[in-house]
Amino acid sequence: MIVTEALTKAFSGPFGAIEVLRGIDLEIAKSEVFGVIGRSGAGKSTLVRCLNLLERPTGGRVWVGGRELTSFDERSLRQARRDIGMIFQHFNVLSSRTAADNIALPLELVGLPGPVIRRRVAELLDLVGLTDKGEAYPAELSGGQKQRVGIARALASKPSVLLCDEATSALDPETTKSILALLKDINRRLGLTIVLITHEMHVIKDIADRVAVLDHGRVVEQGRVFDVFTDPQHAVTRAFVHEVLNRDLPEVLVPRLATTRLEGGPVIWRITFTGPSANDPVVSEMVRRFGLSFNILYGHIDYIQGLPYGTLVVEAAGTESARHAALAYLSQKNLSVEVLGHVATPDPVTA
C-alpha cells in the first residue's frame, strides 16, 4: 500500500544542507496501523509529509496504492491526495464554521452537490460519535471533539490512507485513549491504512500493528509491535520501551542484592513472560518439581496486541542443583531469566 525507497530529505541552512531523512525504506501493508516513533527532531513529521508529498523528497521514491507519487506533477498530486487523509496535532478547524461545515469543506471544494454533502457529513458525524454536535462551533467543543471533527474531515473524500501527525499529543490521557479507540475502530470498519506519527510509546502499544523507530533521520529498528516491545535491539528503542514497561528493580529491593554468591543463600531472578507461556503456572510447577521455595518480590503484567507480557522478580531458595534444573525448565518454556544478584547477608546486630 505505501512504500518508500531510499527516501531522503534535506533543507538548506546557513551552513549548508541539513539532512533530515537519510535513506528511509518502509513497506506499509494495506489496512494495517503502522506507527513511526522518535524523539523531537528525529524526522517524523518530515517523513509523514513526504508520504503525501506536502514535502517533496530530495531523493528516493514514494508509492501509495501502487502509484509512484514522486513522479507526479502538481495536478496529478492534487488528484492523488484525495485518497490520502491527514490529521494533525493542532486540530486546524475553522472557528467561523460549525462542526458539520468544517467536515463539509473538502467536499465543497471539489464541487459536490449540497444533498450529497449533507448526507456524507451526517455519516461522518455518526462515525466519529458527534451526531449531536453538527451545529456546534469549535469554541463549544472540547479538544477531543475538535480532533474528531478533524478526523471526520480527513475521511470526507473516502481515502484509503489516513496520516496522523502527533494527533494525540495535545490531548489529556483519557481523551487520547478515546481517540485511539476511534482510530482503531475506523481501521477495522473501513479497512483504512493508518500511519501514526508519535513520540509516545504507549500510543504505539495501544493501537499499532507494526512500528518503525526513527533516530536522526534513519530507521534504526522496525517490526511487529510485540516483538519490538519484548525484545528491543537498539538503545533508542530500549529507552522508549522503558518508558512504558519499566523493568528496573524497585529501589526498595536494591539494598537486598549482593554481587557475590553466598553459599546456600537465595538468588534473585527476574523472569520475563511473553506470549502463551505467560499463562502457565510456572512458579508453582517449580515448587512441585524441584522443591524450591520462592518469595515473590515484584511483578507486573501488561498486554501488547492482546498478548501478555510480564516480569516477575523472585527470591529463589534451594539447592544449587535444584536451581539449575529450574532454569533449564524455564528455558524449555521459552521464558527469559536474568540473575539479578544474591540476597545480601543481614547486617549484624550490635548491642
Curated annotation (Swiss-Prot):
Native species: Rhodospirillum rubrum (strain ATCC 11170 / ATH 1.1.1 / DSM 467 / LMG 4362 / NCIMB 8255 / S1)
Annotated function: Part of the ABC transporter complex MetNIQ involved in methionine import. Responsible for energy coupling to the transport system.
Main location: membrane
Gene Ontology molecular function, alphabetical: ABC-type D-methionine transporter activity; ATP binding; ATP hydrolysis activity
Official protein name in the record: Methionine import ATP-binding protein MetN
Keywords noted in UniProt: Amino-acid transport, ATP-binding, Cell inner membrane, Cell membrane, Membrane, Nucleotide-binding, Translocase, Transport
PROSITE patterns xrefs: ABC_TRANSPORTER_1 (PS00211), ABC_TRANSPORTER_2 (PS50893), METN (PS51264)
Enzyme Commission designation: 7.4.2.11
GO annotations of cellular component type: plasma membrane
